[in-house]
């Protein structure tokens, strides 16, 4: 099981880092949790810089995807080239989002039959 936590520039640390910490406590050999970002490093809304584990392309093939929130979510969804890199499949992936991350799910073409639900 690969779980990708999609994290953009201006991310909210509470969303991405708590999800990473809690999910990494599951100790199964086939369990992997990754921070997925459009660049090798992203800076949070409070200046915390983290390195990405996987790309957005790799997040698109993960078994589950969690999209975190951030200060720049509206800019993210307005960036058509950036959004095109995130190819999510609601019929084959477990999708979730936190707070404004639901805007990313809604803008990524998720089916209206399976609307995003924020945490």
What are these model-predicted stretches?
Residues 1-95, 102-107, 112-113:
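Extended, subdomain-level signal for the structured scaffold at the beginning of enzyme domains
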């Amino acid at each position: 099981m690969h779980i990708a936590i999609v994290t953009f520039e201006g991310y909210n640390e509470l969303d991405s880092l708590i999800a990473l910490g809690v999910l990494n406590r599951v100790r199964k050999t086939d369990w992997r949790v990754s921070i997925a970002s459009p660049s090798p490093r992203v800076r949070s809304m409070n200046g915390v810089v983290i390195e990405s584990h996987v790309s957005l392309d790799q997040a698109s093939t993960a078994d589950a995807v969690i999209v975190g929130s951030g200060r720049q979510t509206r800019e993210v969804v307005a960036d058509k080239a950036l959004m095109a890199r995130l190819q999510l499949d609601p019929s084959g992936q477990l999708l979730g989002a936190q707070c404004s991350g639901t805007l990313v799910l809604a803008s990524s073409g998720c089916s209206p039959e399976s609307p995003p639900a924020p945490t």
